[in-house]
Amino acid sequence: MMRIAKILSLAVGAIALCVTSAAAKKPIDIDAKMQEYGLVDIATIDASILVELKYAGTDNFVGSNMYGSLRKAYFRPEIARAIAAVQRELRRIDSHLSLIIYDAARPQSAQQQMWNVVKDTRYRRYVAKPNRGGHHNFGIAVDLSIARDGVPVDMGSDFDSFSEVSHIDNEASLLRRRLITREALDNRRLLRRLMRARGFSTYRREWWHFQQYDINYARRTFRLLDF
């Protein structure tokens, strides 16, 4: 897992103070809030999909829990159904394989925390500005990978690796320079093929990120997770 905590230590320290201050307030029932906003837990659609929300722990680029008690992956219902369809196809290909979800619907408060960390660094291009919301803030994006028997397969880089190796727009060059393996490239291509077949589009800097809907349409149509 690539870490930028040392580079961003001052920003992370500021976030820690904010989290401490926020902890003094009455905590919200985040699962109830997600449902209030019309989102569904992916486990209610397909319980076989693995969920390991990276921002609900410390194994992320910030190095702190930004999701509090949230442990479930929430999406708009049609997005959840599309992901479940990908899972069925993946299991049909190989019953030992499963999707593993690293991020799903993201409250705007968590988006603000991420932005506070990266806004004055070269990593800001990887994080959507929180003022209007990005795809995750509407429940229409997913960060995920493939696992075999519960263990993530080789994708060439870790989740949230803010580097060229996570990009998908020049993978032939990455392979030629031995920055990723043929196995990793094949795994990426399998994931993309299955996700695209269910209407998802990609983000060129992150092999793990998939989304549906144009963001401007989403802002006009869907409810921002403004909590």
Annotated model-derived regions:
Residues 9-18:
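Bacterial N-terminal signal peptides
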Residues 1, 20-21:
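Coiled-coil-like amphipathic alpha-helices with heptad-repeat character
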